[in-house]
């Protein structure tokens, strides 16, 4: 390492002021272990799918305690660089779209509990799926349209069972998200619906039944527009559907508050 040439600085006073502005922070042992392991993985000293050394071996190699090793491995897992299963050594992996979106899950659920949080996420879903249906109407293949039709048929068969209908509803929108063939879109779609469904109030089966029938009819309109390759009509049908879903669940939420 090249020594610092103090003459190259304006003065030692400048250096002093600079250090006062940016105090040095001491790194935790676990952070240093994490950084070194990350570099080893990126240099491919450990190949994808290969197991890392055991915790004890890592402790000896880095001369640190077990907590530091475990914290480092947990941090690498959050980055998607390793997978950790109970009773097994950590295995090298590569970040996926699910890993990236999964990191946001806790923050997203906290945000949903804030005033206006659900509305903001519903708007995000509307903007996102609006683009999906327009793309589907323009570019969906016959096979992809057939997949939508099959999802619609399962939707119809599930109308009398609320739990099954919710599952078939999610699957219908998942097929839409699959059409562009982008794994990031799929990860966003799955996460968005998981977050929004988890934030919904509990509603009786009788109240949900009519809502299910309305949603099903709206799904038909979306598929019909996609089959005709009409992106404007597909977008209108999708927006009508999601605005209706939002209004219904907001009404359910207000009703559950009054009952309390």
From Swiss-Prot:
Entry-linked Gene3D superfamilies: GntR ligand-binding domain-like, Winged helix-like DNA-binding domain superfamily/Winged helix DNA-binding domain
DNA-binding region: 55-74
Record-level GO BP terms: negative regulation of DNA-templated transcription
Keywords: DNA-binding, Repressor, Transcription, Transcription regulation
HTH gntR-type domain segment(s): 27-95
GO-annotated molecular function: DNA binding; DNA-binding transcription factor activity
Coiled-coil positions: none
SUPFAM superfamilies referenced in this protein's UniProt entry, alphabetically: GntR ligand-binding domain-like, Winged helix' DNA-binding domain
Pfam family, one: FCD
Its job: Transcriptional repressor that controls expression of the genes required for the catabolism of sialic acids.
Family: Belongs to the NanR family.
Protein name per its UniProtKB record: HTH-type transcriptional repressor NanR
Source lineage: Bacteria, Pseudomonadati, Pseudomonadota, Gammaproteobacteria, Enterobacterales
Gene (UniProt): nanR
